Each structure stands twice: as C-alpha cells, then as structure tokens.
Amino acid sequence: MAEKEITIAISRHRGLAPKAFEETYPSYGNQDQAGDMRNISLLDPNVMTQGPGMAELTNGDQGGVVTTLMRGILRQAVTSNVSYAFGGAKLYQFSASTVSSGGSPSWPRTVSDDGAEVGEDIAHYQSALYYSYNQTGSIGTIGRYDLASTFDDDYWDSGTPAAADLQSAPHQMVNGGDDVLYIANGRYIASLDGTTGNDQALDFPQNTQTASVTWNNNRLIAAVNRPAISGVNQNLSSVYKWNGVDASWEGQPIEINGRLGALYTKNGVTFVWYEGFLDGVVKLIFGLLAGGRVQPLRTFSGSLPLYYQVGELFDYIVWLSSGRLFAYGPLGGEIEVDLFQLMSPQYTNTAGGIASPFGEMLIASNDGGSNYSLERESGYATDSYYKTMLFEPSLGSLKSILDRLEIQCNKLATGAGVDLDLVDNKGNTLWSDSLSFTSDGAVTKKVFFPRAHGENMRLEYDFSAGSSTNPVEIKKTLLQGKNVAFG
C-alpha cells in the first residue's frame, strides 16, 4: 500500500471535547478540541494560553482577617471599590485588593443572634445591605446594615418587618425588577417589599426545598428540589415561574429528573445546573431554559455548583465544580462557544463563593481545616496543561509517523516556556521537546522533527516550567507525517 500523507492542522485551539469528562483519551469531537486541560485560558479566541494565576487579597487569609468560608459574595460594588461578603458568622468588607480590617465600624463584623450562625447570602437592596443566615434551632433569619454604622442582625423577625423565622435552608436573595427582595426559604419563597416581610409569599408542594432563585422577563424563577435530599438520587425537581403577585406560580413548571443546583440569568437568558441520569450514569448538566423546557448545553464532571458558585466573567458564564472554575462562551454569537477550565484557587478541597464585582474574578476557598482564603486573579498559572484529542491517523496495515510539528505563537518573552510531548493511548511518551525563551529566544514559530511512530497519539502542552508573568500564547499547531507499512 502506498504511503499516505498526514496533516493535522489546529488553527484555533478549542475547549473541552464532548467526551472529555468520560474518557482518558477521548477521540470523539473536532480535532481542534481538547481531551483534557487544567487552568487554560481561551478568553482571547486568537490564542490558547495559561489561565490566570490567583493571589490572596491583603488580609485575605486566616493570618489576616478571613477565618470563615465565604459563601455569598456581592456581585457588584456598593460604592467605589467597596463590596461585601458573608460566611460563617462573619460579615466582610473588601476592595479590589484588600479585605478590610478594623476601622469604624470595625471589620470583619461578627454576626450574633441565637448562636451558631452560618452565613448564606448577601444582597444590596434599597440602599442597605441584607445578609441571610441559618442558626441554632433549625431556623433562619436576615440581618440589615445601613451602610453607615447600624447593624440589626435580627432585622427580619425582630425589626420592622416583624416576619416569622425563615426555615433552615439555602437562602439565596435576588432583587426583583418590581423592587422586591425575594428570598429562597425551604418550600417557600419569602419576600421583603420595602419594610414589609412575608416568609411564605409563595409556597411549593410538601417535601421540597428551593435551591436557587433568579429574575428574568419580569418573573421570579425558582429551582426547587423534591425530595429535599442530597447525594445521588432520582429526584423529581422543577423550575417554577411566578409574577410576584398571584397566590400560585404560572403555568406548568419545568420538570427535571434530577437534582437542581443553581440558576443564573445573563442578558435575558436563564442558565441552569443540575445533576441527572443519562445513559445509565449520573452526570452533571449545564443548560438553559427555553420554551418551557431545559435545553442541555454540556455535561461535565465534579461537584454540582450551588447558587453562590455560579456567575459571569466578561461574556462568559462561569461556575465552580470540585474547586475549579469553568467558563462557557463567549455568548455574543460571533465565535463558536467553548467550555474550558480557566482557573483554580489555592484550595480545591472546599469551595466557597465566586463573584467579579470589580471586573476580576474572586474565589473563596478552604483547605478542609483551619485555612481560609479570598483570592483574585494575579499573573498566570504555571500548573497549566492542555492535551489535544487523540489522533488516530493509522490506516489498515500502515502505521503513522509524525515527522514534522510546527508551533506558532505570539513572541516569547523572558521566562516563557512550554514542554511538548506526543503520547499514545497507553500512556507511552513517543517524543518530547520544548519551546522556550531561554532556548529559542523571542521567536514566534518553532519547527520540530519528532519522527514519532504509533497507531495513535495526542500532543500535550505542559506549562509548568513557564512563567507567571510572561505566558506562552499558542496560536496554531500543525502536525504532518505519513502512513507507512509496518516493519
């Protein structure tokens, strides 16, 4: 059989392939997609590069003032360069660079009511700050800070609203377009209309729990699990819509065979994260609400994101799963969308909340013990890697030889570097080399001649020997070779 030329051209390095979470060496998908990655940025569609590194804010750990895991992080600034977060029994104030310490009032502030306070969410509503939490006695409540000097930790039931205690449950809060603050409250939706509180503004069936709420199209949208239990279970959950006025929800809820984690609305589109059974196995699913149904977009693996672990960054939807931040987008429609794992906090053991009130991503995390952190983007990650799909160019009785590899990149700067490996699906390294400023200078292209033999192989980019200040920005990859007879 005559030799056959092989050309594998990657003009734009894409996000994770459809089966990337299910197989070690996925081969299904487009050849420009990834089989695996860690801390990789595709935010600039022109290049594949190291994802953002992360660094603690000043005072942003247990050696400073952060001694609890923050859940609710306000998604916007309240005043110039000032926002807030809530976790455990601590209410935090922070800027883009520093978690506040001391001052008047003194920060962080310890919330105190009936004991064992566990912070849930935080909201800016009608010129005041509201913070929801659970506490001793299987109850919840909401505190209020006037953004000057006065705190009322038991505002919901002992202050002006004089409402009944909330249930012990997730208490996400969302500002409605009708100028009402809506609160998830177990099998109910609670509401705060100015100073009028209602712990049961809307009720759902027995044995349910509201996991997340959002506002879209002048309606409250609620993700409600039934039964209200965690773990791998065949739940019959629903997404409800409510106009905030009627005694019941609108129309038929969207039923989901699985457990709902979170809702998030961006630009008039509501996205949903849930856990369900597909192909006989449990999968995590990211989708959107469309026409009275859920339209799945991608499956992924890890932990199910909760309401405080989803958000947005530029034109991307982002979420935490198993302690790592994923991004999906861009949503503008001009470029094909991708799913990629963008960045990771220093602790992936226990994930807290995320938000970008100042334009950069903030992530709270905990090591499972006494170490806590609030981090922001800083430089570039050096524990990054990107692995292509598995290429299977062999034909019949012929074997593949890849004898030319061309890497195009933006001009290298001091310290920039990436190690390259061709690996087969048995884990054998068929060839290794590197591209670096130290060895190659300020180049924009390098050609290698691997002469790597195999039935299949993939290209792996390892940035661990690179720089946290000068990244390698890969533009294009070209692999060329031929199929030849065995022997």
Q: Language-model segments: which ranges?
A:
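Predominantly extracellular/luminal cell-surface or secreted proteins
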Residues: 94-96, 132, 140, 144-147, ...
